[in-house]
Amino acid sequence: MKVYLLQDLPGTGKKGQIVDVAEGYARNYLFKNNLAILADEKLIEQVKKREEREQRKEEERYQKALDLKKELEGKAVVVKAPGGETGKLYGAVTTRQIAHALKEQLKLEVDSKDINMPDPIKSVGVYDVDIHLFKDVWATVKVKVEKE
């Protein structure tokens, strides 16, 4: 029996999915507890259309991320931080500072959680920083750290 799930059910499916379940399970548990409704042809068609729309949106976001990656590759941002005469900084450059520099200099809104630095930046120099744009799309941007 095909049912439309109204909630996530471990082992059965996620909310909004149409799944095939045993008739007894559907009637005695899913329907009685308002966890699912019977999936008729009209509902199945609506779910298919919704999934196709979501797939198209996903592909568009992926393509935008690829375009943005091409645009960002090779670009650099400058971050100024207080430091000593030897080139060592008094603190470390944070992902939040890099996100702010990206916003100010390249007009790119990036969440600081999407910026990946292998090690903290604690001295003046040029560093490669990875930015997570979409699922498996990463862009590398150069960050030039200068002393204030």
UniProtKB/Swiss-Prot annotation:
One of its GO terms (molecular function) is rRNA binding. Gene3D superfamilies: Ribosomal protein L9, C-terminal domain, Ribosomal protein L9, N-terminal domain. Keywords: Ribonucleoprotein, Ribosomal protein, RNA-binding, rRNA-binding. GO terms for cellular component: ribonucleoprotein complex; ribosome. The keyword Metal-binding does not apply. It comes from the Bacteria. One of its GO terms (biological process) is translation. Binds to the 23S rRNA. Belongs to the bacterial ribosomal protein bL9 family. This is Large ribosomal subunit protein bL9. It comes from Coprothermobacter proteolyticus (strain ATCC 35245 / DSM 5265 / OCM 4 / BT).
